[in-house]
Each structure stands twice: as structure tokens, then as C-alpha cells.
Amino acid sequence: MEKKSIIAVVAILLILVTILIAGMMGQNDVLRVSDKNVIAFNDMMGDLKKADIVFIGEVHDFPEHHRMELEVIRAFHESGRPLAIGLEMFRKDSQKELDSWVQGASSLAQFLPVYYDNWHQPWPRYRDILLYAREHRVPLIGLNIPDAISETVARHGFASLNAAQKKQLPPGISCDVDPAYREFIRKAYADHQQEPDKKFLYFCEAQMVWDKAMAWRLIEYLKQDPGRTVVVLAGVGHAWKRGIPGQVARQSPFTSRVVIPLIPDQIGIDSVTKQDGDYVMLQ
């Protein structure tokens, strides 16, 4: 065989091997936390479809996390299952604008100011998810609370909220930060570990108010539309089982699954437990 022919054959074999490896990685990129086995994405989806709510944790400025979220959303939609997307990124008071966007009644030029009024990340990071929801008429749910409330709690504590501010929160909401929750927040938000005790307590209270309010919003939505699965996109600190999922479990019978990303020094294959999440996306 001529030298050129041998080189061509080797090149083709290398391409085939590369494609095979890429395919294998794409199908086996999920860690099932319960037994620490790496499983196929479709196997994970089979379990996620059993839940009322699927929480997907993200680091907001990691593009690969948003690709993972869209992959799960697309898999749900293509299965024909009724779906909605819950968003930490939007406040409840922007629900009318979210509905208008999904229904195609508002243009991108009209929606972008709404997006940036709610969220600080560049539009391209969430563009594909929001365009997919619009194209396929997947309802979007604004979960968050007004910025002024969370900022007040973070700076001055839950007790500093006035009556008007508390009226904007779910009825009967309280803020009981126990030692276990404080340690959870320290783990999830390494940047805040060195803050003074009182300031860190206020930060924990703000996180809990967020978690409880977003859980309440999810519960109210599912009570009105119980046949729909909600995929929730939120920061890892809210999406972990001790965050919003824990509040949903305490306040309702709705079931949930938690998918979190692999994050160096925070979420590791060896260190992650069933108290953190159900699945870890390895890519």
C-alpha cells in the first residue's frame, strides 16, 4: 500500500475514534450521587421525568452551565411532557412581560430592557434558553423578589423590613438561620467566609428569604397547573437541596430532583453527597 494511502487510512481511523470518544463522553457525563456511578444523560432524564420540579444549579457566568440547562429543557420538551421554566433571574412582578415574550407579543427590542432590569448577566448567556422558550411557547415563571427587599435584608437583617416590604413576601414567612444552614451558605459562597459574624448572618438571612419566597412561588404555580413539570434555573446556592428544594419539601407534597454542576473546590465527585443533589453534570 502506498504511503499516501496508509496516511489517509490512519487519518480516517483517527477521525472515527474521535467521533466515538466524543459520543461516549456525551452519553456518560452524569454522576448519579446515590451510588457515585457515571450514567448516560438519557438515564438521568428518565428519573428527572418522575419529579414535579427539577432544579438545575448554575454558576451564572459559566456558559457550559447554560448549555447543560438547555439540554435538559430540550429533552423535556421533545418528550412531549408539559413544561415550564422557573427563573431566579426574573422577579415575580415581571410575569406579565415574561408572558408577553413567550407568546410572541413583544419584540426583542422591547424585552431586552426587561431582561436587564431584572438581571445583571449579559444577554448572550441566557439568549438561547429564552429564545427556545419563545419558539416553543414554554411558559417562563419569574420567581424572584424585589431587589430592595433582598438588599435590605443582606445589609440590615430580616428584622429591619417594614410592614410594606413584608407584604411583598409570602404570607407567614420567617427567617430562622440555624447552624447547619450557615455552614451550607459558607460552603456555597466561599467569597463570604471571612465576613464579620453579624454581616454574614444577614447574608444568610437574605439567602433564606430568597429560598422561601421562590419555593412559595413554585408551589403556588404547581397548585394551579399540577400536570406540568417545572425546570428551575438558579444559582447553585439556591438550587442545592438545602436551598429552594428543601423549602419546597417542607411546604408541599411536590417532588423534586436536583442537578448541580461540577465546581472545583466546592462540588467534587468525592465530596458531593445526597444532601447536596441527585446528579452532577461532569461536562
Q: Predicted segment positions?
A:
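N-terminal Sec-pathway targeting helices
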Residues: 2-13
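N- or domain-start disorder-to-order transition segments that initiate the globular core
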Residues: 18-51
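Acidic/histidine-rich, surface-exposed loop or edge segments in extracytoplasmic proteins
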Residues: 49-57, 109-114
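Solvent-exposed loop/turn segments at secondary-structure junctions
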Residues: 59-63, 90-94, 146-150, 236-239, ...
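Membrane-embedded segments
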Residues: 62-66, 76, 82-84, 92-102
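Short internal beta-strands
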Residues: 84-90, 258-262
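A substrate-binding/cap region within the structured catalytic cores of diverse enzymes
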Residues: 96-221
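C-terminal regions of proteins
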Residues: 213-216, 221-222, 228-231, 236-283
